[in-house]
Amino acid sequence: MKNTTSSLRRVRLPRTPADWLEAVMNFIFFLCGMLAVCCVVLISVYMVVSGVPAIHKIGIFKFLFGTKWASTAAEPLFGILPFILSSIYGTLGATILGVPIGLLTAVFLSKAADPKLRTVVVTAIELLSGIPSVVFGLLGMQVLVPAVAKAFGKASGACLLSAIVVLSIMILPSIVSVSVTALNAVPPEYEQGSLALGATDTETWFKISIPAAKSGIAAGVVLGIGRAIGEAMAVMMVAGNSPNMPDSPFRSVTFLTTAIAKEMSYAGGLQRQALFSIALVLFVFIMLINVVLNVVLKGGNRDE
C-alpha cells in the first residue's frame, strides 16, 4: 500500500504552462518516434506480402539461382542470379575503388591540408554529395561510356565497369565525410605520443590515427556500400541493362535496382509480382547492411 501511494505521488499532473508545454512536446516526440517505427513495420510487411507470392509460385531455388530472366516470353523465366551477382560485383568493385581514395582524402583533409585548401575540397565534396543521381548517369553515359568503349576497343562501353566507376564516385562523399569526423575525434594525445617516440607524421596517421578511428571509418564504408547497392538511375544509364551473367567487366548487365526500374511501368501479373520479389531481396540486402553498421558502431563503442 505504501509503495502504491509513493508511486502515485511521483506521477504528477502538469500544473504550470511550462509543465503543460513540456508534456505536450514529450507526447509529440513520442508520436514522431512511433511514426518512424510504424513506417518501417508497414514497409517490411508490405514487401513481404507483395514479394512472397511470386517466390512461392516460381520456386525459391529457381528464383534466386536461375540464370535466365525472360519475363515477357511466351514461357517466362524469372531467374535473378545475374541481377544478384551484378549488384554484388558492382558494389564490391565500387568499394574497392572508392574506399582507398575516400580514406586517403579523409586523412589529407583531417591531418595535412592547409585550412584554405581544406575549405575548397570540403565544399567540393559537399557539392558532389548533392548532385542528383540522374546527373551522374548522364555524365557517365556521355563521357565515361564512350571512353570505356574507345579505351578497350569495345562496341559499347555500357557495362559493369562503367557502373563500378560511377558508383565509386557516388559513394565518395559518404566515406570522406564520416571518415574525417572519425579522424578529427581521435585524441591528440595519441598522435603526440607517437611523434614523441620518433614516428613520422605519415607513420602516426596510418599506425595510430586510422586504427583509433576504425569504427567511424567502417561506418562510412558501410554507408557507402548501402548507397551503391541501392542506386538505380545512374546505374541504369551506364550498365547496359541486359540480363547477362557478370562474367566480364565489359559485359552489359542489370542490377537488382535497375531490373525493377526498367520493367515496373508496364509489368503485370506474375511479372509484376516477381519484381516485388526482387524488391524484397534488395530490401533484405539493405537490412543486412544496416545490421552490419550497427554491429560495427557498437563494437567501436565497446573498444572506446
Summary of predicted features, one role per range:
Residues 101-140, 304:
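Cytoplasmic-entry segments and transmembrane alpha-helices of multi-pass inner-membrane transporters
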Residues 180-184, 188, 195, 262-304:
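C-terminal transmembrane helix and the adjacent membrane-cytosol boundary/short C-terminal tail
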Residues 1-32, 293-304:
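Transmembrane alpha-helical segments of polytopic membrane transport and secretion proteins
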Residues 126-171:
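Generic hydrophobic transmembrane alpha-helix motif, especially the helices
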Residues 80-108:
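Transmembrane alpha-helix signature in integral membrane proteins
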